[in-house]
Swiss-Prot record:
This is ATP-dependent Clp protease proteolytic subunit. Signal peptide: none annotated. The keyword Protease applies. Cleaves peptides in various proteins in a process that requires ATP hydrolysis. Has a chymotrypsin-like activity. Plays a major role in the degradation of misfolded proteins. InterPro entries: ClpP (IPR001907), ClpP/crotonase-like_dom_sf (IPR029045), ClpP/TepA (IPR023562), ClpP_His_AS (IPR033135). Its EC number is 3.4.21.92.
Length: 195
């Protein structure tokens, strides 16, 4: 991926560094996935901006298909830990953990563009398949169940929805338009397009 460079007052910035000056952070790594590397970068940016001015708003733009639960929880915990208010804006998609991060913005400051798609589902194991002894698989299965319950609690807290409704809705991929995500409580407003 080529990252554009911006020249401002004889100083060159890559586009993301320039946007960081305006307290704008983008969620996602390669292909927009929330992975350990992208989470580390997002957490560092959140901590930096909070230390710089904990009363000024941070804008978190999300266009992500989701990713690793552990990486997403690291971002989520940081969002809840810092003092600065966080505006979340979905552009394109906020799927899986992307939807959790979207909902985790400061109340009244969670938005989506009109054509954005939001999706919640239960956590899943992805990769090269499951292998190992029965005991190892049971351990992983129990951890997955704990993650599922934890994510249901987080979504219930931020949406105001009943945990059992979220459990039922997220048994399979549950897709929403921006308006449907607003009705569900994942966002507060759908932003109008200027043109």
């Amino acid at each position: 991926m080529i990252i554009p460079t911006i020249i401002e007052k004889n100083v060159g910035y890559d586009i993301f560094s320039r946007l960081l000056k305006d307290r704008i952070i983008f969620v996602g790594g390669r292909e927009g996935e929330v992975d350990t590397a992208s989470a580390t970068m997002i957490i560092a940016q959140l901590l930096y901006l909070d230390a710089e001015d904990s009363e000024r708003e941070i804008n978190l733009y999300i266009n992500s298909p989701g990713g690793l639960v552990t990486a997403g929880l690291a971002i989520y915990d940081t969002m809840q830990f810092i003092k600065a208010p966080i505006t979340t804006i979905c552009m394109g998609q906020a799927m899986s953990f992307g939807a959790v991060l979207l909902a985790a913005g400061s109340k009244g400051k969670r938005y989506a563009l009109p054509h954005a798609r939001i999706m919640i589902h239960q956590p899943l194991i992805w990769g090269g398949g499951i292998s190992g002894q029965v005991t190892d698989i049971e351990i992983e299965s129990n951890e997955l169940r704990k993650n599922k319950e934890h994510l249901l609690d987080i979504l219930a807290h931020h949406t105001g929805q009943d945990k059992e409704k979220i459990r039922q809705d997220s048994e399979r991929n549950y897709y929403m338009s921006a308006q449907e995500a607003k009705a569900y409580g994942l966002i507060d407003e759908v932003l109008d397009l200027k043109k």
